[in-house]
């Protein structure tokens, strides 16, 4: 299972744990390195033992800075209950976006994704471009797809500010259509 985006963000077990998928192999990255290049492949004992009988090459196999970064990430992850934090602030963002989507049907259809990474599904592509541009003009990078990730840096105050800015932009777009 590809857990590049979901691994660690949704807890130690990732999406496969949250949704009950059986996995023989798992791939982790991105969040594990917190910006440093790293990827991890894990699997069942039988699969991982089979790997020991073959030769695997990696361009970055001797790059130890990323391993140190991953070690630090895992320490912070456990100490700060990162997945729990992401779930709380993500739910706040998701529910706020849902209120916006429910109010402005001429601009948005719904909030989509999951709390940890969600987006507003606009009525059409042109509207999503206008939403992203309006948010950028407000100093907010708000992507048009499910890559609006919450992070450990997001607090309730930060999320409320995001929702205010997005809400103002959506309100302005709706007013232009009236």
What are these regions (language model features)?
Residues 1-178:
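Conserved N-terminal phosphate-binding loop of PLP-dependent enzymes in the Aspartate aminotransferase
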